[in-house]
Amino acid sequence: MVKKFVYGTPFETEAVVKEIPSSEGNPDYGTFSTENGFSFTTKLADDDMVFGLGEANRGINKRGFLYISDCADDPNHVESKTSLYAAHNFIIISGETHVGFFFDYPGTLRFDIGYTTSDTMTVS
């Protein structure tokens, strides 16, 4: 099932080509906040793996690292980089629960996937 949640007053980015009506209330998974800008936070179980973010550095499981989605044109793609050119703001959490999130946001997003706190993922 696909649900769409809208926060603030977004403009059309054409990243999603199918019309999906906005859902009311809060998602069933994680917590969204707009108090100090946008943020999404969820707990991660010990065996949860996190996949996605397109061509981001590191291995296929993105857990345990910090990623910045900022579309920076930097040719030196090494393990210590937190941001590459393309922004693929889609993640899948696989483990006790299987759920995916797409963040249609044209600005900078920070994906802290168990980096600051090993059992917490925060997107802000």
Where are these predicted regions, by residue range?
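Catalytic and substrate-binding clefts that recognize carbohydrates or anionic sugar/phosphate headgroups
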Residues: 1-124
